Amino acid sequence: MDISNIDKNLIETLVRQIIEEKISGTKDTVDFVRNKDISGITSIKLPTVKVSESDRLDTGNPSDVVYTKDLFTLEESPRLGCGMMEMKETTFDWTLNYDEIDYVIDGTLDIIIDGRKVSASSGELIFIPKGSKIQFSVPDYARFIYVTYPADWASQN
């Protein structure tokens, strides 16, 4: 086994996380690497966040390729929602009954509103105000973080 490519920082983070869980008596049940202090302050290693079929968003069109994965529960962050979204060659309609900021990690995200397009690529973000009737559109691929207010965006009418 070639261990020369092992990320020492990742191993250190995992070991610290295991020790903290043992000390605090809690188990972090997420499937990505994060450092959660007992104060609630949390860091997440975004490259370790992976989406799967269980994270697929039902847009009403089975050919749409859209995945969302919340990074915090409502108990952990009752006011702000935050998650990872990945899309591939997809455009779908959406109405936001909440405020949202999308920070693009990889690829390009287009937001279409009233026939106009607002785009963001890697390292850029888009703010979408509450009440916007838009289309999320990705011509190729995009991976981005969404931050919503309020946190319980899915139940907003």
From Swiss-Prot:
Catalytic activity: acetate + ATP = acetyl phosphate + ADP
Entries under CDD domains matching the protein: cupin_EutQ
Enzyme Commission designation: 2.7.2.1
Keyword list, A-Z: Bacterial microcompartment, Kinase, Transferase
UniProt enzyme class: transferase
Record GO biological process: ethanolamine catabolic process
Taxonomic superkingdom: Bacteria
Location of this chain's protein in the cell: Bacterial microcompartment
GO CC term, one of those recorded: bacterial microcompartment
A Pfam family this chain is assigned to: EutQ
Main location: other
Associated pathway: Amine and polyamine degradation; ethanolamine degradation
Transferase in keyword set: yes
Keyword Transferase: yes
GO molecular function, one term: acetate kinase activity
Gene3D superfamilies assigned to the protein according to its UniProt record, in alphabetical order: Jelly Rolls
Known function: A bidirectional acetate kinase that may drive flux through the ethanolamine (EA) degradation pathway under anoxic conditions found when this bacteria infects the host intestine. It may generate ATP that can be used by other enzymes (EutA and EutT) in the eut pathway. Might serve as an assembly hub for bacterial microcompartment (BMC) shell proteins. Overexpression in E.coli leads to lamellar structures that inhibit cell division. Expression of the eut operon may allow this bacteria to use EA as a carbon, nitrogen and energy source.
Similarity section: Belongs to the EutQ cupin-like family.
Subunit note: Homodimer. May interact with EutM.
Name the record gives this protein: Acetate kinase EutQ
Taxonomic lineage from the root: Bacteria, Bacillati, Bacillota, Clostridia, Peptostreptococcales
Gene: eutQ
